[in-house]
Amino acid sequence: MARPEGGYYQDGIRVVSLTEALSATRVRRWSGNERSWDRRRKIGSAVHQACAILDCNGKTWDTAPREWIEPYDAVSHEVRGFCHAWERCKEEQEIIIHLVEHSFFAKLEITLFATTIDREGLRRGEPALIELKTPQLKEAYWGVQLAGQEMATVANLGPPRVRPFKYHRWVAQLFVNGTYKLIPYVDPMDFAIFRQSLNIAVWNRNAYGE
């Protein structure tokens, strides 16, 4: 299931998303003014869409047909730099991709939630979940987001079948100059924070319609 537009639904019922849960509890929050946030959001969305098309078709920004990338280049010329950064990350980190922008429904105890993982695959032969990020400053919620995504992935696919039989969680922080940082997340507290955020978000929705 690819990332849906307009929210996640199961049997006609809207399901709370991972990012909605983190936003409702202010684990995930935005800094800066509304105008800068909107610009960041548009560029980030274009980068995700462009990288997904390229990854799914085994192309790079420079080898893809022009008609594929022109819509994203039109959003901002910065998109090219971010895509080059992801291409460099994949090559240098020996990343093999199995799933691209793949959505899951998952139950955490009795609470249903939905999420979309950016990439699932291998990094240097070991199982990896990788989030692509374009903000220039590291944001605190990234580890919690990845923890929720790991829960959803394992609930749907089961544990990885290659050593060490668990996922390593990474953020590929991409920069417009074509460089990147690959940031590991290992804090077990991230899982507890996600559980609490999801429960509070669902309670708020049921109690107040929020």
Label every PLM stretch briefly.
Residues 1-113:
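Metal-dependent nuclease catalytic cores that hydrolyze phosphodiester bonds in DNA/RNA
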Residues 78, 95, 102-210:
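Nucleic-acid nuclease catalytic cores
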